[in-house]
Structures are given as C-alpha cells and as structure tokens.
C-alpha cells in the first residue's frame, strides 16, 4: 500500500512547472520508496542506498582527493609550527596539546554558544531566545548531537575535543547549523511564506546531505574562522568525513572488517580510535550507514556554492534556510 501511494504521489508531481521543485519532490519520493523497501525487509545494495535513499553518488572519495586533503593539512601544520614526524603524528600532537579537560568544557561551550548565536542572528537568521544546554554523555555512537525540542546538545566525552573542535560542534549542531535550519523553516511555514514540505529538511532522506552540508559549513557561513587552528580543524573535519565515506563504502562493498575500517580511519583520517569505532558502528547500520556519505557530499556542495556566491550570498542563504532541497535541486536552483 505504501509503495502504491508513492506511485500515485509521483504521478501527481509530473505537472509541476518548476523544474527545481519537481526535481526535489521526485528525489524525495525515490528516497521514501527506498526506505519503504528497506524497512519492509527487502535487500538494497549499498550503491542503491546511496543514490536512491541518500541522493549522493555511489562512489568512494578518490585517492587523489584524499591526497590533496593531506597536502592541505601539511601546509596548515607547517604554518602552526608542527614540522617533525609524519603528518598523522603532527596532527595528533597539535590536537593533544589543545584538548579541553572535561571540567573546562561547560564554560567553553557557553562562550562559544553565545558567540555563535550572536553571529548567526546578525548574518543568517534571528534565533530569538532559543538556546541549547550542554548534556555530557558517554558510550554513544556520535561525537555530538542536538535534540531540538528538548534544547539539549549532547557532547560525547569519550571523544576528546579541542576548542576548535567544540566550535565546530556548536556551529554544526546549533548556530547556524541544524537548530537554526529548523527555526527558520518552521518560521517561514508558520508565516505562510513557504509550503509545509519545507519542514522535511529534518528527514533522513535526500534532505540529509543538505542538513550536514549546512552544519559542516557553519563556521564559514558566519565568518568564524579566527586563526590557523580553526582552519586546521576544518581541514581535519573534511579529511575525516572523506575517510568516513570511504570506510563505509569498503565495509559494505569491499568486505572490509570492523578492524580494517577502524585502522583506515586512524591511519588515513588521523582520527582518534574512539571516534573511529563510533563511525564504524554507524557505518555498519543498514539504514544509518549510507548517510555517512551525506557529510562529505553535502559539505562539498554547500562549500562550492558558498565560495562562488559572490554578491548573491542572500540568495544562497534563502535556499539554505527558507527552502528544502536535495543536492541536485539546490545546485539547479543556484545555477
């Protein structure tokens, strides 16, 4: 019955005149159809999950791209004065010297949250009195997560964080990331400025890559890169989302073991073992796993559009925060 309803819905989309909107809605139907088939017990190949469920290319990140990300990090580590040892050793030395002690995290969190909200209110969307409380957790399969309705931001204390990494989490999860996107889309729908499907930005479907792209570009969207440490953290994040995309691919397509995935994330992505175990666990989930690719492809999409926005920044922000998109429809809207 669900698949028949989706067939009927797909047919109703055909007359829509807007090519961009039609592209998004057809992508959503395709994604929902894949989810229905998956939760009905049908087997879907990992490649089909990527293209149909997540709406990203069915391919790993090329080795050449990984090498280029390493080269960029090498330049940043050199600028920061870390020139001895392998690149991985230099990155870990840089991080280790800046890890926050658990007892220091609440104060740093409050400081960063206030500044992120100030910048978001000025540059993206007025967030009003919305805020998030820190909720420290352990033994969970994520580094950070926001609960919009409860107003909690979970921070996994099993994964050590620097100030720059905490800044990324705040920007990704709250201001101007996930929470801000939810606040803005809810407001425009309530005011009648957008159709209710704008609220689909929260769904794990082809919209997921846009959520993660906005989150990972959060620091840049509010012009919050303050020093080389922030730039290095962004470089590490891009590398690790690329490595996470590849680890998930090889677990499902190449027959990698958990141990191989963890080793790859540590050795190629320069990740902590605790984070690598968390990511590998997520990658192995039959539904959640393919969405790991949404971080890489979503970030690269929003990054490329932001970098060439020039005088059309408001047009970009309008589509990121007041509309709902897939990667394909966003590129089409901003072409």
Question: Language-model segments: what does each one mean?
Answer:
Residues 1-335:
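N-terminal maturation segment of proteins
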């Amino acid at each position: 019955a669900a698949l028949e309803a989706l067939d009927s819905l797909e047919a109703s989309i055909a007359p829509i005149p807007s090519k961009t909107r039609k592209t998004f809605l057809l992508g959503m139907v395709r994604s929902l159809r894949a989810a229905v088939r998956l939760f009905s017990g049908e087997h879907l190949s990992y490649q089909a999950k990527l293209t149909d469920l997540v709406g990203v290319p069915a391919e790993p990140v090329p080795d050449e791209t990984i090498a280029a990300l390493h080269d960029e990090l090498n330049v940043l580590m050199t600028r920061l004065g870390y020139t001895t040892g392998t690149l991985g050793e230099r990155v870990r030395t840089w991080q280790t010297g800046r890890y926050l002690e658990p007892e220091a995290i609440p104060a740093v969190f409050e400081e960063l949250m206030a500044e992120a909200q100030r910048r978001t209110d000025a540059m993206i969307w007025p967030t009003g009195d919305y805020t998030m409380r820190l909720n420290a957790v352990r033994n969970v399969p994520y580094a950070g997560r926001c609960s919009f309705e409860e107003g909690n931001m979970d921070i996994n204390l099993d994964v050590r964080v620097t100030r720059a990494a905490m800044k990324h989490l705040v920007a990704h999860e709250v201001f101007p990331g996930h929470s801000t996107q939810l606040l803005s889309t809810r407001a425009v729908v309530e005011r009648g400025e957008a159709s209710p499907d704008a609220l689909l930005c929260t769904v794990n479907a082809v919209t997921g890559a846009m959520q993660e792209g906005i989150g990972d570009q959060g620091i840049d969207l509010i012009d919050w890169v303050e020093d080389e440490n922030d730039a290095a953290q962004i470089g590490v994040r891009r590398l690790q989302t690329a490595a996470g995309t590849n680890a998930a691919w090889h677990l499902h397509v190449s027959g990698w073991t958990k141990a191989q995935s963890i080793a790859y994330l540590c050795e190629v992505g320069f990740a902590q073992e605790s984070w690598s175990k968390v990511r590998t666990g997520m990658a192995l989930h039959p539904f959640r796993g393919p969405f790991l690719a949404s971080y890489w492809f979503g970030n690269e999409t929003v990054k490329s559009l932001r970098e060439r926005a020039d005088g059309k920044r408001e047009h970009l922000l309008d589509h990121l925060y007041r509309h709902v998109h897939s990667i394909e429809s966003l590129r089409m809207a901003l072409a």
